[in-house]
């Protein structure tokens, strides 16, 4: 399998490819949001850790570098909305109190699990933490994240008119174009 080949697979079941892989990228997750898109809290809380365990097991068997996409939702709720470049794991995640829902908690759990796999299987891991992702393939009608939500507000605003911007003006945001 080459980097430009897509392998469709239900990640809740064991991946049985018989190839050497330098890297395993685990970049997606089922994300519940305010518009009911994706699974329920229970569905995502069950499904995402299972998928991560399957990906970690595969990477461990293949001695692959494991790259897991972590979400800014892992940060303690006191630091949500202030996700600038000064955030760090020890000061802003612990004590654990992820924002919003089970999604942040399971992302934090999966990140910690990857660290344990790295120790147990002598694996190399990378854990990039992404903030506010957006791009041409994001469906603004089905995504309640800040960029999509602001686009919907702009489209629905009267001309000329006003629209509400959330927050008190002190929040910092990091955006990731995908």
Residue ranges and their predicted role:
Residues 1:
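N-terminal Rossmann NAD(P)H-binding glycine-rich loop of SDR-like oxidoreductase domains
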Residues 8-49, 58, 76:
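NAD(P)H-binding glycine-rich loop region in Rossmannoid oxidoreductase-like domains
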Residues 20-22, 63, 122:
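Residue-level detector of structured alpha->beta connecting loops
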Residues 23, 51-54, 65, 109-110, ...:
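Conserved cofactor-binding/catalytic machinery of classical short-chain dehydrogenase/reductase
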Residues 24-30, 66-72, 128-130:
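SDR active-site strand-loop-helix element
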Residues 80-87, 112-178:
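NAD(P)-dependent short-chain dehydrogenase/reductase
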Residues 102, 106-109:
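Active-site helix of classical SDR
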């Amino acid at each position: 399998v080459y980097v430009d080949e897509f392998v469709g697979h239900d990640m809740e079941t064991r991946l049985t490819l018989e190839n050497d892989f330098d890297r395993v990228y685990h970049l997606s997750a089922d994300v519940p949001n305010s518009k009911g898109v994706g699974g329920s809290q229970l569905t995502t809380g069950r499904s995402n850790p299972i998928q991560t365990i399957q990906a970690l097991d595969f990477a461990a068997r293949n001695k692959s570098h494991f790259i897991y996409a972590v979400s800014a939702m892992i940060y303690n709720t006191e630091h949500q909305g202030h996700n600038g470049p000064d955030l760090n794991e020890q000061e802003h995640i612990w004590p654990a109190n992820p924002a919003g829902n089970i999604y942040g908690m399971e992302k934090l759990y999966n990140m910690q699990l990857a660290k344990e796999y790295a120790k147990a299987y002598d694996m190399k891991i990378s854990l990039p933490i992404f903030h506010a992702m957006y791009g041409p393939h994001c469906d603004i009608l089905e995504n309640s994240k800040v960029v999509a939500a602001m686009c919907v507000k702009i489209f629905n605003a009267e001309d000329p008119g006003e629209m509400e911007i959330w927050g008190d003006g002190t929040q910092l945001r990091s955006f990731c174009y995908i």
